[in-house]
Amino acid sequence: MSGKYRVGIIGCGGMSRNHVNGYLNCGRYEIAALADLNESAMTDMDSRYKLTTNHYTDAREMLAKENLDVVSVCTWHGGHAPWTIAAAAYTPKAILCEKPMADTLGNAEQMLVACRRNGVKLAIAHQRRFLPAYTLAKNLISQGAIGQVQLIQSFGGDGLPNYSSHKTDMYRYLLSDDECEWVMGNIERKTDQYERSTRIEDCALGVFQFKGGARAMLLSDLVPNHYQGAKIFGSDGMLDITTEQVMLLNKETGGKWDLQEPDGKFFKLKELGKRFEWDEGGAGQADELADWIEDKVVHRGNAQNGYKALQMIHAVYESARMHEKVVMPVRTRVNPLDLMVESGHLTPERPGRYDIRAFLLRGERMTSDTE
């Protein structure tokens, strides 16, 4: 394509900034239109990025009028499915939806159907797949640098769907998208806690078995210092990764930790510091989306991978609900945590609904941002 792809954004809160950053930094897009319930959110977006865009408080009007090539869905979780389905009906070339893919597996499956029947490419914004540290670790594992992976250990927080869907996606990416065979997990929920209007647990533990023999263990809200990254234990060595660096220990390193801090395609790590994770990941994600539109590659964040990351999260809830090991795929298409609470199986001991992301809303809104 000789020109730039026209992008429309649905939902102009904090996560949309990562999408806009990515589109602008890779240089292959123009931001044409914004849709949000709050005019000030769109005005702030224009001001922050020096944009001149058309504004809509009705996203369907934007979809009908703007002849968009790409749509970003950046609402809260409950809006991901309805707005992806709505956008697909207007047949853009691609949709980039924030993670987690949806609030239920059934809704995620409807997103897949809507995009498939309309010929629309759908990607889920697990942008850490585009971080050079993660890709370096993936390549070291596939090259046998630590032998057979035996355990991946990671720590999460702020609820499984939001934070830890990045973890389950990371496990699969590090293992070259190996398939998860079964999941065993449990949760504690003594408060009526939500995250972006999605019901979450107070803490959780999940164990994931992969077909290739590796296992992963996730501790969520069980340790004070959670982070994006992992410790990876193999038969012949170890990796300790964060979003910026990879530490390798094996026979070739003389039993000492070897530190690597790889730069990205778009940015150098030392130039951006903590912004590197967001700016490099976002630009890489957007750049590969353009390549996917042009049929040069299959996007590594394609919706099938996003769906499988969500399945693994819901498998933890389903394991807690059924008190059993859950063999994949998960067959319950509603949220198992919702089932537990609404059936009385898991009643909060300390009633009173609260949302840990309510501070992100504008005006009088306290509980929802999905219309």
Residue ranges and their predicted role:
Residues G13, H19, S40-A41, L51-C115:
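Beta-loop-alpha module in the N-terminal Rossmann-like domain of NAD(P)-dependent dehydrogenases
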Residues T91-P92, G119, G213, K296, ...:
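Glycine-centered short loops/turns at secondary-structure junctions
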Residues M42, G281, Q285, M312-M322:
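Stable alpha-helical structural segments in soluble proteins, enriched in small hydrophobic residues
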Residues I31, T52, L68-V71, I146-V149, ...:
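Local beta-strand N-terminus motif with an aromatic residue
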Residues G78, L96, M101-K167:
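A contiguous active-site-proximal alpha/beta segment in oxidoreductase catalytic domains
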Residues M1-K50, S368-T370:
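N-terminal Rossmann-like dinucleotide-binding module
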Residues K231-Q304, V326, N335-E371:
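C-terminal glycine/acidic-rich active-site capping loop/insertion
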Residues Q150-Y227, K231, Q304:
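Rossmann-like dinucleotide-binding domain that binds NAD(P)(H)
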